[in-house]
């Protein structure tokens, strides 16, 4: 993913001075949670690029603006309590997860979005920074079928100031997510 021409229209920043980038190899000077994400990518042999954004990326909209990509190329990681099991749901930034569909996909009676304290406790990441890797207490990961299957996607990378860019095929492979319909219909 180091070929700039390959990414020209898929999420390159409009203001290169606003962010700092490095591949998942190299200098270790980022927060522990970001290093944990980087190590998970390395262990999986994934080609991913972690970037730091000075102003942070607290929402999907802010992330898309910082990265310079379409909102649909941002992947939100949402934690659900499904009858006592923790399930991470991945949906594109321009969609919302449908709790009824999550419950159905997990054969649960009810799926409830986790609160901020639960997200931190279960994932080890803060809300807005959840990476879909290095998740010891998550039993399943569901990937919405409407997430783009080609090109670069951007995910949380362990802190509100960090995002990881990787190919859509890498996201599915690295997370071992189940491809299902979990987004609200529009």
Each model region followed by its residue ranges:
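Extended, low-hydrophobicity, polar/charged segments
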Residues: 2-186
């Amino acid at each position: 993913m180091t070929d700039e021409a390959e990414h020209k229209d898929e999420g390159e920043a409009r203001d290169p001075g606003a962010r700092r980038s490095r591949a998942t190899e190299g200098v270790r000077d980022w927060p522990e949670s970001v290093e944990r994400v980087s190590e998970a990518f390395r262990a999986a042999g994934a080609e991913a690029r972690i970037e730091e954004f000075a102003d942070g990326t607290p929402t999907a909209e802010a992330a898309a603006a910082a990265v310079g990509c379409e909102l649909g190329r941002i992947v939100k990681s949402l934690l659900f309590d499904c009858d006592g099991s923790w399930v991470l749901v991945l949906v594109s930034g321009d969609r919302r997860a449908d709790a009824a569909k999550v419950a159905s996909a997990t054969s649960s009676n009810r799926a409830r979005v986790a609160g901020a304290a639960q997200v931190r406790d279960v994932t080890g990441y803060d809300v807005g920074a959840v990476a879909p890797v290095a998740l010891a207490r998550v039993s399943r990961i569901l990937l919405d079928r409407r997430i783009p299957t080609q090109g670069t996607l951007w995910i949380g990378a362990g802190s509100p100031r960090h995002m990881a860019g990787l190919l859509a095929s890498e996201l599915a492979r690295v997370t071992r997510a189940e491809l299902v319909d979990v987004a609200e219909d529009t």
